[in-house]
Amino acid sequence: MKNSSQKEPSIFNLAVVVAALGYFVDVYDLLLFGIIRVPSLASLGLTPDQVKADGEIILQWQMWGLLIGGIVSGIIGDKRGRLSVLFGSIVLYSLANIANGFVETVEQYKWVRFVAGLGLAGELGAGITLVSEIVPKAKRGVATSLVAGIGLTGAVLAYFMKELFDWRTCYFIGGGLGILLLLLRISVFESGLYNQVKTTSVSRGNFLSFFSSADRFKRYILGILIGLPTWFVIGILVTFSNDFAREFGIQDKIDPGKAIMYAYAAISIGDILIGLLSQYLQSRRKALFIFYGITIAFMIAYFTMLWGGSAAQLYWICAGLGFGTGFWAIFVTMGAEQFGTNLRATAATTIPNMVRGMLAIFILPLFKWFERQPSIGYVDAGIYTGLIIMAITVVAAALTRETFHKD
């Protein structure tokens, strides 16, 4: 097979296709716990209150795995090559998901989700980095948005698997999909740009480099902060939509797995459209601000229009929230483009996983802190957390460099 540098760049080349399929499996496994959280924990003998409390703990452990795994896989990706991460990560999370089908206690559950998080961390960043280096800059936003748009439908598949099979079988299916992807991934080739970096004396994959320069540190932190709304929306508003529904007085039974499915179906559409929008505007930042506005509009709808509402209303508002936060690939691409090829995989892998990890270390703890205050209830805790998240994000985006024309 020819090296990627000898091929005519296209948004439909092998790297883009395999990255999209890889992200599809990644999202299936990443969101599966949120989708089957209630039935799986209930089958272990937990009460509804324990399902809520232990579900939050297990989710935090998974996100800690993503946070740590993102750092490790980013460094390995730059030092040993993208393929080492793409192969290693898929083996780890495939085996973890198969093991997840055998858990019998909450303790086992949280440890297996932690290991799965370690593996899942490497999938999107390494794939997006390969795509961003192979596809020319004029088509890069569209290509990465296609990867995310196709990949995010993995959550839709996870929901329908949950409807058709027992929760343990759903985990076995996730592991099986990973193994099938591993066989396909043999054909993936390394990025030509990255191969050029291997021959230079530039330091590759030094995670501490982000902290050795004030300018690099600023770019790195801003890259994380512009993505915060995604996991506030998915990790709090959508995943725990059944708990919010009780507070809103919704009488219909709410399936948080269905809410996640609605959200991710819309996210996949948003992720493709934002790529086209950024192409039309010739700006990633302008497209990002438009989608922030959509997110804020549906947050307002979530907290004002659902009191005494119906399940259908909640699901459609979750879809609107999903569409508004359909900027995942664009923000990951912006993060990768802030740095040279020597640090691009480290940035592209650690930044999105730092955002995912922020659910465990900042977003969920902030939400729980507000909830514990005597004069603040569950819904108000969500409102205050959302206000803080969006304020931080908008300021960060305003301070972030435009990267659309950066090679």
Predicted regions mapped to residue ranges:
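Helix-to-loop junctions at the C-terminal end of transmembrane segments
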Residues: 70-81, 271-283
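Helix-loop-helix hairpin linking two adjacent transmembrane segments in secondary transporters
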Residues: 147-186
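Extracytoplasmic gate region of multi-pass secondary transporters
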Residues: 34, 216-268, 360-363
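Cytoplasmic membrane-interface "Motif A"-like loop-to-helix N-cap segments
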Residues: 79-89, 280-292
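Cytoplasmic helix-loop-helix junction between adjacent transmembrane helices
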Residues: 112-149
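Extracellular/periplasmic helix-loop-helix junction of adjacent transmembrane segments
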Residues: 36-68
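Conserved MFS/SLC helix-loop-helix module at the cytosolic interface between two early adjacent transmembrane helices
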Residues: 68-104
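Helix-breaking motifs and short loop linkers at transmembrane-helix boundaries and internal kinks
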Residues: 81, 102-108, 282, 305-308
